[in-house]
From Swiss-Prot:
Residues 1-21 form the signal peptide. This is Altered inheritance of mitochondria protein 6 homolog ARB_06966. It comes from the Eukaryota. Keywords: Glycoprotein, Secreted, Signal. The lineage of its organism: Eukaryota, Fungi, Dikarya, Ascomycota, Pezizomycotina. Glycans are attached at N91, N184. It comes from Arthroderma benhamiae (strain ATCC MYA-4681 / CBS 112371). Belongs to the AIM6 family. One of its GO terms (cellular component) is extracellular region. Its main location: secreted. GO terms for molecular function: phosphoric diester hydrolase activity.
């Protein structure tokens, strides 16, 4: 796949030397039609990217947040269907970063996530005389019905910050791109599903009968939770299973396996997906074995810091 992409790019780039294997007339045709509207696919912004059930953990650490989770710097598809941003509220602005010392005035929820999301969604939902109204396709051209989970981890003063987050979603809301709940009973899927986590106040989520945001369910105890509140629930893997032996052929012993199976079963009975965070990233063999085990046991999302490795896993 990689070689074919590179070969096509070499043929079509006018700045490159002619390819000897092709006749000169064909080379000229390929070069001269490169920018013609006839040969431009209208929703090609994510063309060829296959979505994978991976959560881009601490996505804002990446060289290019949001975009890297979709396509990596090397143009090798990543296709993560879930991304996460930590936010701090200061002076009515939502800044993105893991801790306060890492914040900058340029890195905001708006600049790193809302605006890029709108940019991609506008490209995957172009105006067309061939459709009767606006479309609600997701960010992945190969699977337009796949939602993108946007987790917003509130790091300070959740009660005060959450209304600002709801307000920040307005561009996505106006374009009808958000998954929503109507009258506390009707689930309407959309291109983007927002899930509040960290310091997100549960009371401000469940109090709205009509809303376009959800809550990260507490996987340890889902009493009182439904998929209308929490489409996905999460918890720390380490807190559930304790120490994991990296030198063992099987990363989880029978007792540990039973613990996660019990949680996954309880969540599935409520139609709630499961994600485990704080999963070891090293040694590589252990990480991969844990991914394999968790996926086999039925989690909805695999937590990944190395999205390239996760893509290779699938």
């Amino acid at each position: 796949m990689k070689s074919s992409i590179l070969a096509s790019a070499a043929i079509l780039a006018a700045s490159l030397e002619p390819v000897a294997a092709l006749s000169e007339p064909l080379q000229n045709i390929l070069i001269n039609t490169d920018r013609s509207p006839i040969y431009r696919y209208p929703t090609d912004v994510t063309r060829g990217i296959v979505p994978i059930p991976v959560h881009s953990h601490n996505d804002y650490w990446r060289d290019i947040p949001f975009y890297t989770a979709l396509t990596t710097k090397l143009a090798l598809s990543a296709g993560c269907i879930s991304i996460e941003a930590d936010v701090f509220l200061f002076n009515d602005t939502l800044y993105v970063g893991h801790e306060e010392s890492a914040l900058t005035k340029e890195r905001t929820l708006q600049s790193l996530y809302i605006e890029p999301l709108m940019n991609v969604l506008k490209k995957t939902n172009p105006k067309s005389p061939f459709v009767s109204g606006p479309t609600r396709h997701g960010v992945f051209d190969t699977s337009s019905g796949q939602t993108l989970y946007l987790w917003i981890d509130v790091k300070n003063d959740g009660e005060k910050a959450w209304p600002h987050i709801v307000k920040a979603l307005q561009p996505l809301r106006d374009a009808n791109y958000l998954t929503k709940i109507q009258n506390n009973e009707s689930f309407v899927p959309g291109p983007v599903t927002v899930i509040g986590t960290g310091g997100t106040p549960l009371s401000q989520v469940v109090s709205a009968a009509d809303r376009d945001y959800f809550y990260d369910g507490p996987l340890k105890d889902l009493t009182g939770f439904t998929s209308l509140i929490s489409p996905i629930a999460s918890t720390s893997l380490m807190e559930v299973v304790g120490d994991i032996k990296s030198d063992s052929e099987n990363p989880l012993n029978p007792t540990q396996l039973e613990a996660i199976r019990k949680q996954i079963k309880a969540a599935k009975e409520k139609s709630i997906g499961v994600r485990y965070w704080e999963t070891p990233g090293w040694p590589i063999r252990l990480r991969n074995e844990l991914w394999r085990t968790l996926w086999k046991e039925g989690v909805a999302l695999l937590n990944a810091d190395d999205v390239n490795a996760a893509k290779g896993y699938f």
